[in-house]
Amino acid sequence: MKYLERLTPSCWRIKPGFVPNMKVEGRFYVNKALEALMLEELQQFASARGVGGFLPAVKQIANVASLPGIVGASVGLPDVHSGYGFAIGNMAAFDMDDPEAIVSPGGVGFDINCGVRLLRTNLTLEDVEPVKEQLAQSLFDHIPVGVGSKGVIPMNAKDLEEALEMGMDWSLREGYAWAEDKEHCEEYGRMLQADASKVSARAKKRGLPQLGTLGAGNHYAEIQVVEEIYDKEAAAKMGINKKNQICVMIHSGSRGLGHQVATDALVAMEKAMKRDGIEVNDRQLACARIHSEEGQNYLKAMAAAANYAWVNRSTMTFLCRQAFAKQFNTTPEELDMHVIYDVSHNIAKTERHMVNGTERTLLVHRKGSTRAFPPHHPLIPVDYQLIGQPVLIGGTMGTCSYVLTGTDTGFRDTFGSTCHGAGRALSRAKSRRTLDYQQVLDKLDKKGIAIRVASPKLVMEEAPESYKDVTAVVDTCHAAGISKKVVKLRPIAVIKG
């Protein structure tokens, strides 16, 4: 433990030397329970060599700290768990002016722009409870779900090219989004550096039939009810003004298209690393210099995949609005079904941050980590200037979700980043071995949660028991001051792939 040091009750430091070539320190945020999970994983690794195919999260955070061009610290957020290359819940920023600085697809993840969108309504629990089952069924019928699910939005190859370049502007033009939806979306739902020509034919082939589909795994659409309001002023700015108000949360990403973009880039970058003599501690950290051809190609393709994911969430928003309007025999406008915000938690972005007292342009990798900008930041919508950027934290099936806001402390300490959800505690394989799907469904039923699942066998992987406690994760971020609690939401109906 000589390389690990507790800095504050909720933050640990990983000192350089823990792994070779560390350029900056590592830091991770945990409370008592989460700390035990992190250190147990490390001890298991030390005694048994290996946790599945991944290194333990503490080691992964340290390996990222050894990548060329990194500044500040390699940061692990409270929901951190081991992933491909970077841990999921790891944030790292690289100096764009350093010719050696790199971009790594493992620092973004395979599901590019996997993210969360929250819609509010003017309905209350009393309105929805009697028709909960019908509403869940209606959502399930409207939104295509599951592993190979096909979209219902008519699309040809030309439409896909445009959607990849235009993001939510495409949804707006095609009539699937409201003008103000864009305002309440990170990047306004469109990354301008997207270049569809950098997305391979295979990725496009995978993406074409899947637009407007939910996908499987931890993706879901949830009908939620406001259970607690911690910050009345901030909640009011978001249009949340009472307990028992109904909201809808959509969690989805770029489906097979984003996965293929990441896979293609990793192949190209392995070659670039040999050519440029880039050495890394773990071959899963394949990367390329930001300004190399491979680095730029990846960033342009990643932006296109991110746009695809925003179009995807917009399409599902459209289908959600349809389902609600049909059930309540009115219009989505009458139901006040506005987007509160839409955040990404798997993405790399160019941002300005202070490093050692000077402002620098950085490429911030957030993998399983959410942007959380403070009040008055120029990149957040006018409506939220006084309270800070809304941050949406999805729980797991049957547990609570949270809305937080960004803070100045977070902007300084974690480059404006916070957690993204609960974070796995059990691997998918272990969840399947130890949990029984009927029990998982019965438990949800007892909590009064209506559930519709396309692939019941996947339920165990996503059972609350497979995850860390989302409340512990959010409370740790709140205690560390890197984001602030605003609202707690509880699910009453879940639609899953």
Curated annotation (Swiss-Prot):
Membrane-traversing stretches: none
Catalytic activity field: a 3'-end 3'-phospho-ribonucleotide-RNA + a 5'-end dephospho-ribonucleoside-RNA + GTP = a ribonucleotidyl-ribonucleotide-RNA + GMP + diphosphate; a 3'-end 2',3'-cyclophospho-ribonucleotide-RNA + a 5'-end dephospho-ribonucleoside-RNA + GTP + H2O = a ribonucleotidyl-ribonucleotide-RNA + GMP + diphosphate + H(+)
Cofactors required: Mn(2+)
Molecular function per GO: GTP binding; metal ion binding; RNA ligase (GTP) activity
Co-factor note (free text): Binds 2 manganese ions per subunit.
Alphabetical keyword list: GTP-binding, Ligase, Manganese, Metal-binding, Nucleotide-binding, tRNA processing
Binding site for Mn(2+) 1: D111, C114, H219
Keyword Plastid set for record: no
Assigned protein family: Belongs to the RtcB family.
Extra information: Ligation probably proceeds through 3 nucleotidyl transfer steps, with 2',3'-cyclic phosphate termini being hydrolyzed to 3'-P termini in a step that precedes 3'-P activation with GMP. In the first nucleotidyl transfer step, RTCB reacts with GTP to form a covalent RTCB-histidine-GMP intermediate with release of PPi; in the second step, the GMP moiety is transferred to the RNA 3'-P; in the third step, the 5'-OH from the opposite RNA strand attacks the activated 3'-P to form a 3',5'-phosphodiester bond and release GMP.
UniProt name for this protein: RNA-splicing ligase RtcB homolog
Source organism of the structure: Monosiga brevicollis
